[in-house]
Amino acid sequence: MKFIVKPHPEIFVKSESVRKRFTKILECNIRNIVKSRTESVAVFNRRDHIEVTSESNEYHAEVLEILTHTPGIHHVLEVKQSEFKDLHDIYEQVLELSRPLIENKTFVVRAKRRGKHDFTSIELERYVGGGLNQAVESARVKLHNPDVTVKVEVSGDKLNQVLARHKGLGGFPLGTQEDVLSLISGGFDSGVSSYLHIKRGSKVHYCFFNLGGPAHEIGVKQVSHYLWNKYGSSAKVRFISVDFEPVVAEILEKVDDGQMGVILKRMFMRAAGMIAEKFKIEALVTGEALGQVSSQTLTNLRHIDNVTDTLILRPLINWDKEDIINLAREIGTEDFAKTMPEYCGVISKKPTVKAVKEKLEAEEAKFDFSILEKVVYEARQMDIRDIAKESEQAAPEVEQVQAVEEHAVVLDIRSPDEEDDNPLEIAGVDVKHIPFYKLGTQFGDLDQSKTYLLYCDRGVMSRLQALYLQEQGFNNVKVYRP
């Protein structure tokens, strides 16, 4: 197994020292993730690319998944590496691999060469291309826009034949930019805005203002852990939860109805600014888009920004909602957002779209700011890697089983795409598929006389969902970890 990783082109327009630093960070990020999930996989920095190799193909799919979801990578080449004797030997090896690919098609050979050889790259292309054209009668050479491009790389005495090219995330390696604090609600917008900053190279910490109790917090932890695990697991980041119900209660009691929405957002920013300062985080990230709701007019956003000196970043400010949802679907957060409760929009019946500074300040003068200081002081912070451990500790009564007991039903709670890619089939066992985001509404319709074993690939989602179901009063659930 061998992959050639090409860093994002923006890295190579940097100065030599910055380029070296960025590629070194990318190398370390890849190595850290690969070592945490696989064995016997080596990572090498080759200046203009990074090689990931193993003697075995056991972790092929796992490594490819890691590389295509790691920030800073433009594309990944999947290659077959072998030794060669001479130019004709190269041709014979390429013919063996490429014959079925070019039959009844047009093709071109593109070659790259490093090291000392008795042939040039152009001579290599002509020799191999001419040989393929003669050996495969139904194939035809076409230099521009062919059906198939046969890619060959020669480095020293090694021949690399490109089997496939996979698109990377792009952006910058994680950790090359300064840290940010994402105000995450679990909805479409905050998940996408967090992803965009991960992709751009920032370590994204998560701050959740809890307005909806334990069930809401569990859901937000799930999407935060998913984003970290899928795109940023090379970094150590924090998840911070702030119980904002006392603040909301004070606003509902003291503040004029029309000003509630903007003042709540101002309280969010004040609290987040204090947390960012405590942890030396340079900027806040929100999922706000211009005009999407009443608090997101330019006037209101300016009043919201003015309560903190911390930089506020809004990567979605000019995005349409449809585009946000499409990207959420692409990165895998759509299913979380679909069932995430939304609380912020319900506290003001007639919200202002053009707040006045003096009126906001007059309403806030009624507010007891010691409540805000108290909830920030009592905020709970944890290493995001401990979310899975917390789910175990928070629900020790959730039993894990390795074998399916008699009459039990296995519930595959993975997303439809994951289930399609690797269906769960167990001989003699009733396996049902209910995606995790539908469990809350569909589990109660199942036969409650039976025991249900929740299954996901890593066991994190199944434990969190089991905790959620038990909070709803269902005690017939266990976690299936074969």
Curated annotation (Swiss-Prot):
Top-level EC class: transferase
SUPFAM superfamilies recorded: Adenine nucleotide alpha hydrolases-like (SSF52402), Rhodanese/Cell cycle control phosphatase (SSF52821), THUMP domain-like (SSF143437)
PROSITE patterns per the UniProt record, alphabetical: RHODANESE_3, THUMP
Binding-site positions, ATP: 183-184, 265, 287, 296
E.C. no: 2.8.1.4
Transmembrane segments: none
Active-site residue list: 456 (cysteine persulfide intermediate)
Catalytic activity: [ThiI sulfur-carrier protein]-S-sulfanyl-L-cysteine + a uridine in tRNA + 2 reduced [2Fe-2S]-[ferredoxin] + ATP + H(+) = [ThiI sulfur-carrier protein]-L-cysteine + a 4-thiouridine in tRNA + 2 oxidized [2Fe-2S]-[ferredoxin] + AMP + diphosphate; [ThiS sulfur-carrier protein]-C-terminal Gly-Gly-AMP + S-sulfanyl-L-cysteinyl-[cysteine desulfurase] + AH2 = [ThiS sulfur-carrier protein]-C-terminal-Gly-aminoethanethioate + L-cysteinyl-[cysteine desulfurase] + A + AMP + 2 H(+)
Cellular compartments per GO CC: cytosol
Residue stretches making up the THUMP domain: 61-165
Homology family: Belongs to the ThiI family.
Protein name: tRNA sulfurtransferase
Protein's organism: Vibrio parahaemolyticus serotype O3:K6 (strain RIMD 2210633)
Lineage: Bacteria, Pseudomonadati, Pseudomonadota, Gammaproteobacteria, Vibrionales
